[in-house]
Amino acid sequence: LLVIPPGLSKEWKEGNIVSLSNIKSLPRFQELCEKYNFIPTYLITDEVATDSFSIDLLSNWQDLKKAEVGSHLHPWTSPSLVDRLKGEHVFPSELTREEFKKALTDLTDSIESGFKIKPTSYRAGRWGFNNMQIKVLEELGYIVDCSVSPKIDWRNTVGKKNSNGGPDFRGLKTRPYYFSDSKVLEVPITILYTGLFSKVDGYMEKLFSKMDDGFLKRVFNRLFFQMKWTRVFPESSVSDWKRILKTAQKNNLPVIEFMIHSSELSSGTSPYTKTPESVERVYRELENMFRIFSEAGLVGIGLSDFARN
């Protein structure tokens, strides 16, 4: 599963500058996906859902069944919230149920109007997911969410002022699962311990994940756990993709979910890609990852098709 949230080029910086220039970088990424028969899921925000260039570009791939288009809610760009939030990057989990449902309904309607499809896949902006959102997703026809980042605690990440930060996912599963009393499938981003203790959803994983961040946890991680995100970071290398693949195979995971922001695919639009050289490095690692996964027999599928199957 390849999940790509296309969005603003300047949202990594302070200010309210709105630019979708990084969307123009997506054809190169799409071409790489098609080279390895992988089907990306583009989870889009309100500003992308109403942009004519983005609609034309993504609709073409969607209509050819080479990509899926789903929803990605950023409260600070939602028409019903933008004036009140004034650029404050609150987590969707910090909204009331009424605020969240209105914002997601508007986004869903915009996608349906522009792309002539009803979106069924979703990710909360900034990983800001909570139980309140599950029933709303179901009411609006969504069948799959990918907002959970297992092993990660976002409570120290600032969202709403004078609030408690983001969600704590450390106790949640790595494998896909259904929320209780719900038909919405959760497909977490693949974050694995690839060291000595690599059993997925096992006792040691849960125990270590619950440890407070600090020097001791960093030492244990380096020696025994070696946590790896299925994302491209400046320090990523071929060995990371091999470790992730080996751990996934050993644990019989049904899926590996990778994600990248569209802003990380163009120069000067992300802290990870400040220069053209850094963009080329990202693409080298993407090529390495896709090649390793493809040679191992992994087959690409969109989020919603995975949920249906």
Predicted segments with their positions:
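Surface-exposed, active-site-proximal loop segments in enzymatic domains
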Residues: 4-14, 82-94, 268-274
